[in-house]
From Swiss-Prot:
PROSITE patterns: BIOTINYL_LIPOYL (PS50968), LIPOYL (PS00189). The modification N6-lipoyllysine is found at residue 63. Residues 22-104 form the Lipoyl-binding domain. Keywords: Lipoyl. This is Glycine cleavage system H protein. Its cofactor is (R)-lipoate. Binds 1 lipoyl cofactor covalently. InterPro entries: 2-oxoA_DH_lipoyl-BS, Biotin_lipoyl, GCV_H, GCV_H/Fam206, GCV_H_sub, Single_hybrid_motif. It comes from Clavibacter sepedonicus (Clavibacter michiganensis subsp. sepedonicus). It holds the Pfam family GCV_H.
Amino acid sequence: MTDQTSLQYTAEHEWVLIDGDVATVGITSYAADKLGDVVFVELPAVGDELAGGSVVGEIESTKSVGELFAPIDGTVTEVNDDVVASPDLVNSDPFGAGWLVKVRFEALPTLLSHDEYVALVGE
């Protein structure tokens, strides 16, 4: 499991782990809890160009369907096929095995710190 205090966050409940010019993206445990049991995940394809803030996939649960937003501009370099095959990883390990995509970026937008995200969700 990733140290959540070292991550950056979006107001759309996604976390971002920066490693050089690649960002690993997932949804937070707050979002996973609100969704309930995740049963389907649709992700962008490797090579897709993402525009920050745009809808790039969806996460379907027994309660609802949520949109997956691109937190940054960039190119998808890797998708987590394990999450597509076993969507429950989003619930069981959202900050680890439940990561969604890796994106190569040129410029990083302003994201929320851990403390700012905790204040946003009130947890």
